[in-house]
């Protein structure tokens, strides 16, 4: 098995990812006021060659002290987006990456 920190690069923080986490906490930060889900979901940036079972094993080993169990892993490959640099004079692209939305079992949380 690879080093878990080579598989999981970092926590992915966006407004949508925070809304998913808020739904699992039941604090009403979702689309519907007071809505929540039983299974907590967290989003991570992962290695491009990481598979779903490898991501699940890496997260369970990183958070072994909290004894979390992964229920499911959904992966999304984000394509490079066009970008302009140096006040619009130079065209380029942002780097593409792979993100994983991980669902834990009820009662298990990393937060």
Curated annotation (Swiss-Prot):
The keyword Ribonucleoprotein applies. Keywords: Ribonucleoprotein, Ribosomal protein, RNA-binding, rRNA-binding. GO terms for molecular function: rRNA binding; structural constituent of ribosome. One of its GO terms (cellular component) is ribonucleoprotein complex. HAMAP family: Ribosomal_uL23_B. Part of the 50S ribosomal subunit. Contacts protein L29, and trigger factor when it is bound to the ribosome. This is Large ribosomal subunit protein uL23. It comes from Chlamydia caviae (strain ATCC VR-813 / DSM 19441 / 03DC25 / GPIC) (Chlamydophila caviae).
